[in-house]
Amino acid sequence: MGKENHVFAPAYKEKDMEELVQICDHIIFNSFAQYEKYKEMCRESAKVRKDKKAVSVGIRINPQCSTQEGHEIYDPCGYASRLGVTEEQFREDLLEGVEGLHFHTLCEQNADDLVTTFQAFEKKFGKYLHRMKWLNMGGGHHITRENYQMETLKKLIRYIRETYPVEVYLEPGEAIALNAGYLVTEVMDIVHNDMDILILDASAACHMPDVLEMPYRPPLAKGFEAGEKQYTYRLSSMTCLAGDVIGDYSFEQPIRIGDQLVFEDMAIYSMVKNNTFNGMPLPGIALLKEDGSVEMVREFGYDDFKMRL
């Protein structure tokens, strides 16, 4: 690839590890038991790699410092979390061959939460950083957000580099495509039961599962909070799942069958997490160009549904 390639998983299968040691530069283990299982394979990896360099091994840490509110499903520091080694479970006697430490505890957060997390990490694990080559502080950093505390981040990185002999890594995955992508839907029907309900050709369960899992309310072009404007509707889907509801929105004008509604900030996770529950079609993928023209990149049909079975 010509670039560094890092990988983490809560556990690895042996057949996967045999390939990973050939193509990954950093391999991070979720437990010392997993590290012990593949320690020799990592140590001998230079023999099977094109660059003739052994992989750099890391251990994922759980600093047990929750900074998230409202979406526990994305909190690796929550109760009984399986992700990362706690201070109680840390094995200093097994650190031979370990070159890095890793934590990933944030989700769509600012730099002040990263500082809080690092301080908790440093208090429990800082003494081991002097023996490491790198520190990976994971993802969840909204560094492209308008109000992101960039100076706070810079100050923290400078402190780490001046205090410990480590290279610092960040993984701002979502931030790279923040507020990008649209999901264009059509109103198929309008029914009434306590309130007006729009039946869309899109689905929270199939096309934006984070709406139900996180949960969260996706931004909608020309849509407002329920009750804020004159016309309020519940947006739902064509599946048989009663709870397949995207949310309640209000509009300045009444919505009619055949209208298009456009959800925003849909690039993140939309393709990797979608599914065909109930036979719901996958949304086509189109490219909106700067001149306003649209290029259809990929469309999906029955064969795609069939081949996933």
Where are these regions (language model features)?
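Conserved, mostly hydrophobic/aromatic
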Residues: 20, 59, 101, 137, ...
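Glycine-rich beta-strand-to-loop/alpha-helix junction loops that act as flexible
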Residues: 105-106, 135-144, 172-174
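Acidic/histidine-enriched ion/cofactor-binding microenvironments in catalytic or ligand-binding pockets
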Residues: 123, 129-132, 151-163, 249-262
